[in-house]
């Protein structure tokens, strides 16, 4: 609805009514969030590392210490807590699983395929960064048994790491 009434008077936000005649307060009092299923939200971090001489490009992977995909390599990541932003969760998970902190990351992509996680409906927000890796040694922690840099190699047909 408009914030201006029919006689051109300003209507304060708290007094504005929707098509059912409800103010925002009345609407929220009767609102039932249980009408919608709740997906979980996770974050993953894609960390590229470059040597200072620019001759070596690597990607940081962790070895999962638990199901699903136990003993498989994956991007560092985990669940977003209800009280934190996705970026805060990304920073927390990166430090918990690799020991790395104070690394600036950019949001890259949101993955929302309904069956992408075997546990439940999960929406994942991926972050990415490129950092100099000379002298940076990740330390596995939390639910990661390893945290390692893998070389990225290019050939005519595929990218491998």
Predicted regions and their residues:
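N-terminal leader/linker segments that precede catalytic domains of diphosphate-processing enzymes
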Residues: 1-161
């Amino acid at each position: 609805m408009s914030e201006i009434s029919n006689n051109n008077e300003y209507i304060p936000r708290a007094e504005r009514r929707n098509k059912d005649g409800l103010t925002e307060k009345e609407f929220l009092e009767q609102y039932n969030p249980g009408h919608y299923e709740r997906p979980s939200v996770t974050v993953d971090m894609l960390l590229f590392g470059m040597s200072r001489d620019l001759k070596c490009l690597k990607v940081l992977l962790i070895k999962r210490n638990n199901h699903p995909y136990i003993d498989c390599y994956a991007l560092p990541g985990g669940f977003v807590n209800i009280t934190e932003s996705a970026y805060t969760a990304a920073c927390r998970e990166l430090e918990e699983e690799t020991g790395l902190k104070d690394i600036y990351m950019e949001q890259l992509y949101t993955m929302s395929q309904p069956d992408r996680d075997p546990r439940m409906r999960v929406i994942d927000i991926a972050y990415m960064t490129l950092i100099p890796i000379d002298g940076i040694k990740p330390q596995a922690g939390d639910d990661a048994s390893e945290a390692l840099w893998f070389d990225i190699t290019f050939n005519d047909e595929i990218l491998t790491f």
